[in-house]
Amino acid sequence: MKLTMSAIIMLGLLLGSAHQSAAQDATQTLYKMKCQICHGPDATGSAAGKKLAVKDFTSPEVQKQTDAELLEVAKKGKNKMPAYDGKLTDNQLTELVKYMRDLAKAGPKGK
């Protein structure tokens, strides 16, 4: 009985980990498809994004914004950033904000 319970717990942990990894992979793919062209691979802004005055997502100025403020920009757009309300789900946008925050925590590549 003890072995069976341990096996069930381990299976649950493995399945949960696989689900989380798949969700993270989906968000990373979505970032690459929708965001990276302007925000760059590390959220500091690509060459094209910098020409459009994209803000460095790793900067204190951007990081002090709340998730709700960042979601509002993602939904409605701002300046040259397109609006994604109706194009992406609220969950996708929320996960993208989390992903970009993780990129910001990791810091710019090469620094």
Residue ranges and their predicted role:
Residues 1-25, 109-111:
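N-terminal export/targeting leaders of redox proteins
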Residues 6-7, 41-43, 69:
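Short hydrophobic/aromatic-rich motifs at helix boundaries and adjacent loops
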Residues 6, 14-16, 28, 50, ...:
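Generic structural signal for beta-strand residues in well-ordered domains
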Residues 14-30, 46, 67-69:
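Electrostatic cytochrome c docking/interface patches
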